[in-house]
Amino acid sequence: MHIQTLWPQAIVVYPQGLNTPTPHDPAGTRSGWQARAGDLGDRDLRLFDAIVATMRRSYGVDRRRIYATGFSNGAVFSMLLWARRPQTIAAIGEVAGRLDPAETLTTARALVAIAGRSDTVAPFVVQKQTIELARQVNGASGPGLPCGLHCRLYPSANGPVPVKTFVHPRGHVYPLWASTKIVSFLRSHAQP
C-alpha cells in the first residue's frame, strides 16, 4: 500500500492478520480478518481497539483523523470497523471489499471504494451493494459526478461524507494507482 511514502506526516500502522477461515480458505491456512462482530471472539476488533489506544497514548494522534484501509479481506475488515467502530473511524479507503451481510452501517462516514468489474473473488455485484448501502447511509443519492478515469463522486446531503468510487475493468487486484487515490481522499476528511 505504501501509504507512509505518499503521506509521510501520517502515522501508519499495518497489522498482520492471523490465520482466518474464509469462504476461499475454509481451513484458515492464510492470514485474514474477521468479517462480522462476534467472529473469532472479536480478536480483530479487540486488536484494533488496542492499537488505537496505544497510538493515542504514545503518539497523541488526532482523534478526528483515524482511518481504515484494506484490500480484499482487509477491506472487509475496514468495512466492519465502519459498522462497529464509527465513533473512532473518520473515513474508509477500501479496495475489492464489501460489508458482511450480517452487518449494517448506521453512521455516515466518508468512503472511497475501488472495485473491479471482473472481480471473481469479491464479485462486483456484491461490492456494488456495499457501495449502494454506503451511499444510502451517507445521504449520497443521485447519479454522482464524473471525477476522472473510472471515477464517480457522490456528494452527501448530510455534510462532508461523500462516497467516491473508482470502478475499473480488471479483476481482484490492488491497482498501482489505488494508494494515491486513497491517500488523496483520506487527507481531505476528518470526523465532524
Residue ranges of each PLM-predicted region?
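Active-site loop/turn elements of alpha/beta-hydrolase fold enzymes
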Residues: 15-19, 97, 170
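Short alpha-helix in the alpha/beta-hydrolase fold that links the catalytic acid
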Residues: 123-136, 145-154
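Stable alpha-helical elements in mature extracytoplasmic
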Residues: 44-51, 73-81, 85-88, 126-130, ...
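Primarily recognizes the serine-hydrolase "nucleophile elbow" in alpha/beta-hydrolase
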Residues: 57, 64-109
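C-terminal catalytic histidine-bearing segment of alpha/beta-hydrolase fold enzymes
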Residues: 114, 140-192
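Serine-hydrolase catalytic machinery in alpha/beta-hydrolase-like enzymes
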Residues: 1-67, 80, 84, 165
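Alpha-helical scaffolding within the catalytic cores
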Residues: 1-2, 95-103, 146-156
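Acidic catalytic loop of the alpha/beta-hydrolase fold
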Residues: 118-122, 172-173
